[in-house]
């Protein structure tokens, strides 16, 4: 995400940053030339004349006034933009786009402000993200560009404009800080106040709104596909020191972006990536550490892809609609025809606005404006601002009776239900039109339509039992921003219909028939408001540590692990206290018997299996105890050995891995704790098991030693002292093989010693071949040039030395051929051993070329291996560049000789 989005510029901007000030008020600061400057000289053309101080002050005041006027003008522009965004609907889209482009976007500062307003609006109203994305597309094409002409990009890519760059920069900032505002409330130890609950809900809406907005912009190619993939990877990856159950916010954002832009990303070229994403989502979906809501969100998203990205009907109609579309949906869904507005000067609800209409009714309707002409006000919910004036689920029939007792749950007037709102004339009119029957049978009609609800529900809910008639409420759902314990005044708390249980669409009834959508005469079941239960505050750190001590002491005495686990679970400890609780478990068992230490280790493993603690919790606890070692050693001298036992048992029970344990102990931290842990592992298991596990961990043993000891010889010495040299059989071989060759250089003796002391598995190991060749080369060099001789590496060796070198190499030929024959990869390793040997000897004159020729003539190394060494680009072995320079001409000859031989064979 970081590198991909960074093309948009800085991730933060404000009114004072960027180039916005270049078009601000002109500021004049005239220079004053002192008398000494032009003394005896004629001022040049560029010299500025002296200006009286009074004129300067007047210019300064003028600049300040201009600056204030400029600020007022900007504020007026931003107010106008805010007003345009509040009125934005699909019907007025083109008209309002033109208005927005004509508000006076004449500087980068104003453009930044416009972008901030659009993004904030899109984040507050995620349902209308697609509309705001269309607006951004229009502005990206038509808004002024203040960056100047850019270099031509690749064909097919959208040109980067100021608007697009600043928009991506703002979205990057929101994405990187997506959970900041939500985490502020989640980290509170005390229960949130109602106002804080509402603020947290608003912050979460904005977080999800930003993700959805990014997806909608991605649909329109305003954000490149690579950026979308980086967003998804960022949301999916497991962060260090972050528990899985704390990834809920990121996974919810992931589901949002997948639902929004998943179909666009799921094409043939990106199929492998998408498969990886969804494989990870499937594994997370089965994790018990995640909340059930997040697991179901992941399941819905996985099922959405399985159904070829065709959403259930419940999610189809959530976007912004025109008024004509709403009228058509009303006809399809409920069989109610809402006529379009009549000619100018007339209203579609003529009879409701006539002279016989009661004054109270007019007063109730007038303030609503626009939508009141169609539906009236929705009961129990606000209309909202901007595009949000359209509720995503409504019933036109219900909207017309907002003051009725059955809908509001209380009586506000003495008049009967029909007449209480429309008056006597209105009631007669309704009865004459058959609307009274429509009104009273609505509940019954709704119940009959609920039978087809399963197609709108997720598969996991389709087998649940049907709703009883008395459990259905016709009141629309309250705003989700309200606190769970809050209930609107004068309205009892009642059972709500789940969104997926809304009535499915039905065909329009035949002409002349009255739609049967009336209410039952029985009022909906009213549940009594549950008594408020005061939430018990979480225990303090001191209380938790005391409880932990009690539970652990009892467990060590009784040995009942289940009771101990239940005791820890019942503490309901905040997650940030868990490491200290585990530290307490370890410390309490340190001065006890080995059996009690093993019990404590088992308890920690059980807490991990039950999902109460995590591997990170254990590592933090373990390191906390290590930091206390100087104090603990006063009473418990062998504390590090005991802690090594805890670490070893944690590795055996797969609570942590060797690499996870090694990371904080690098560079000899708490030395020799890591080696003590390996000793305990070898003791509790066996050497072969530990060797295989250690090799898989890829831990660099030299880095685990203090810096002064980080070399092969010292490492082997330390490992032998701890009885751990078996972990590096080749390292031990390197030292002993050279000693054996010096003792008896005959090839038969060397080969027999290798067979007796080296495992057959290692005979085809590159490391073994490297050590074998290095030992031979070191022996030959020591014999030809004894250490006592002060020979210059730049001088050529004598004929006697060259002959001795060749004879020694010839004597080792049978052993070399035995292990290198028909193994080109091992032969390449032998050449690298020669390269490193020459590098360590400062490349003696002609040595590398001589040995290349000897290896070739003696048929120890094949032509294919020489050429493979030349083409190999590994950086593992030093001196490759200089080595190539010395033998390049000979390798070229070898290639041409091979070609000539192949041509002769062809002839």
Curated annotation (Swiss-Prot):
Modified residues annotated as Omega-N-methylarginine in this record: 360, 505
Reported tissue expression: Ubiquitously expressed in all adult tissues examined, with high levels in skeletal muscle and heart. Also expressed in fetal brain, lung, liver and kidney.
Name of protein: Eukaryotic translation initiation factor 4 gamma 2
Listed PANTHER family: EUKARYOTIC TRANSLATION INITIATION FACTOR 4 GAMMA, EUKARYOTIC TRANSLATION INITIATION FACTOR 4 GAMMA 2
Source organism (scientific name): Homo sapiens
Domain W2 residues, every copy: 720-904
PROSITE patterns: MI (PS51366), W2 (PS51363)
Domain of life according to the entry: Eukaryota
One Gene Ontology molecular-function label: cadherin binding
Amino acid composition bias (Polar residues), ranges on this chain: 503-516
GO biological process: cell death; negative regulation of autophagy; positive regulation of cell growth; regulation of cell cycle; regulation of translational initiation; translational initiation
Region (Disordered): 1-71, 498-541
Cysteine-cysteine disulfides: none
GO cellular component terms, A-Z: adherens junction; cytosol; eukaryotic translation initiation factor 4F complex; membrane
């Amino acid at each position: 995400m970081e590198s991909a989005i960074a093309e948009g510029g800085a991730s933060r901007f404000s009114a004072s940053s960027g180039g916005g000030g270049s078009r601000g008020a002109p500021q004049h600061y005239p220079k004053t030339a002192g008398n000494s400057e032009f003394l005896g000289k004629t001022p040049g053309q560029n010299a500025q004349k002296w200006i009286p101080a009074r004129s300067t002050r007047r210019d300064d005041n003028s600049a300040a006034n201009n600056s204030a006027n400029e600020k007022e003008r900007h504020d007026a522009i931003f107010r106008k933009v805010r007003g345009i965004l509040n009125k934005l609907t699909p019907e007025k889209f083109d008209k309002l786009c033109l208005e927005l482009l004509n508000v006076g976007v004449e500087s980068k500062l104003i453009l930044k402000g416009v972008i901030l307003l659009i993004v904030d609006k899109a984040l507050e109203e995620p349902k209308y993200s697609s509309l705001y994305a269309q607006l951004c597309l229009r502005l990206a094409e038509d808004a002024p560009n203040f960056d100047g002409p850019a270099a031509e990009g690749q064909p097919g890519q959208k040109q980067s404009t100021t608007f697009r760059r600043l928009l991506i920069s703002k979205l990057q900032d929101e994405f990187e800080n997506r959970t900041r505002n939500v985490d502020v409330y989640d980290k509170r130890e005390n229960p949130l106040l109602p106002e804080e609950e509402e603020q947290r809900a608003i912050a979460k809406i904005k977080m999800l709104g930003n993700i959805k907005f990014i997806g909608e912009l991605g649909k329109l190619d305003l954000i490149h596909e690579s950026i979308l993939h980086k967003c998804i990877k960022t949301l999916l990856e497991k962060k260090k020191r972050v528990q899985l159950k704390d990834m809920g916010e990121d996974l919810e954002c992931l589901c949002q972006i997948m639902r929004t832009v998943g179909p666009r990303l799921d094409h043939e070229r990106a199929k492998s990536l998408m498969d990886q994403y969804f494989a990870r989502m499937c594994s997370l979906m089965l994790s018990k550490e995640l909340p059930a809501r997040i697991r179901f969100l992941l399941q819905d998203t996985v099922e959405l892809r399985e159904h070829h990205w065709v959403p259930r009907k419940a999610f189809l109609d959530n976007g912004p609609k025109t008024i004509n579309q709403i009228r058509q949906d009303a006809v399809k869904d409920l069989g109610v025809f809402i006529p379009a507005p009549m000619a100018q000067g007339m209203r579609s609800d003529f009879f409701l606005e006539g002279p016989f209409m009661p004054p109270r009714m007019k007063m109730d309707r007038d303030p609503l404006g626009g939508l009141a002409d169609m539906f009236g006000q929705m009961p129990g919910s606000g209309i909202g601002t901007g595009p949000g004036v359209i509720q995503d689920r409504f019933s036109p029939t219900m909207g017309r009776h907002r003051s009725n007792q059955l809908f509001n749950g209380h009586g506000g007037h003495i008049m009967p239900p029909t007449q209480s709102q429309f008056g006597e004339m209105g009631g007669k009119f309704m009865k004459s039109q058959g609307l009274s029957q429509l009104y009273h049978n609505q509940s019954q009609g709704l119940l009959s339509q609920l039978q087809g609800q399963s197609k709108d529900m997720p598969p996991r809910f389709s087998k649940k039992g049907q709703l009883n008639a008395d459990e259905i409420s016709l009141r629309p759902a309250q705003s989700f921003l309200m606190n769970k314990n809050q209930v609107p005044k004068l309205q009892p708390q009642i059972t709500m219909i789940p969104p997926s249980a809304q009535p499915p669409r039905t065909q329009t009834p035949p002409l002349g028939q009255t739609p049967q959508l009336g209410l039952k005469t029985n009022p909906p079941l009213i549940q009594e408001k549950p008594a408020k239960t005061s939430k018990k505050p979480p225990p303090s750190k001191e209380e938790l540590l005391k409880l932990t001590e009690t539970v652990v002491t009892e467990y060590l005495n009784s040995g009942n692990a289940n009771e101990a686990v239940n005791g820890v679970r019942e503490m309901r400890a905040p997650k940030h206290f868990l490491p200290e609780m585990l530290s307490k478990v370890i410390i309490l068992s340190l001065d006890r018997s080995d059996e009690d230490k093993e019990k404590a280790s088992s308890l920690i493993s059980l807490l991990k299996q039950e999902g109460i603690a995590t591997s990170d919790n254990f590592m933090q606890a373990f390191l906390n105890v290590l930091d206390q070692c100087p104090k603990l050693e006063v009473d418990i001298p062998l504390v590090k050995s005991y802690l090594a036992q805890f670490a070893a048992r944690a590795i055996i029970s797969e609570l942590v891995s060797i690499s996870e344990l090694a990371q904080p102990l690098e560079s000899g931290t708490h030395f020799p704790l890591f080696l003590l842990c390996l000793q305990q592992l070898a003791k509790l298991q066996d050497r072969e098991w530990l060797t295989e596990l250690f090799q898989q961990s890829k831990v660099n043993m030299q880095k685990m030693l203090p810096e002064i000891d980080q070399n092969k010889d010292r490492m082997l010495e330390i490992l032998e002292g701890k009885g751990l040299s078996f972990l590096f059989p080749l390292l031990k071989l390197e030292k002993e093989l050279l000693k054996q060759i010096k003792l008896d250089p005959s090839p038969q003796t060397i080969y027999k010693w290798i067979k007796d002391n080296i495992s057959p598995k290692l005979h085809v190991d590159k490391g073994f071949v490297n050590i074998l060749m290095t030992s031979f080369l070191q022996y030959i060099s020591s014999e030809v040039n004894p250490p006592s001789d002060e020979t210059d590496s730049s001088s050529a060796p004598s004929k006697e030395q060259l002959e001795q070198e060749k004879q020694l190499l010839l004597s080792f030929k049978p052993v070399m051929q035995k292990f290198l024959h028909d193994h080109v990869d091992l032969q390449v390793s032998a050449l690298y051993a020669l390269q490193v040997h020459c590098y360590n000897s400062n490349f003696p004159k002609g040595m590398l070329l001589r040995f290349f020729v000897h290896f070739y003539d003696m048929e120890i190394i094949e032509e294919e291996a020489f050429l493979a060494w030349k083409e190999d680009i590994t950086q593992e072995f030093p001196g490759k560049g200089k080595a190539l320079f010395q033998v390049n001409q000979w390798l070229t000859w070898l290639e041409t000789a091979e070609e000539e031989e192949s041509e002769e064979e062809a002839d």
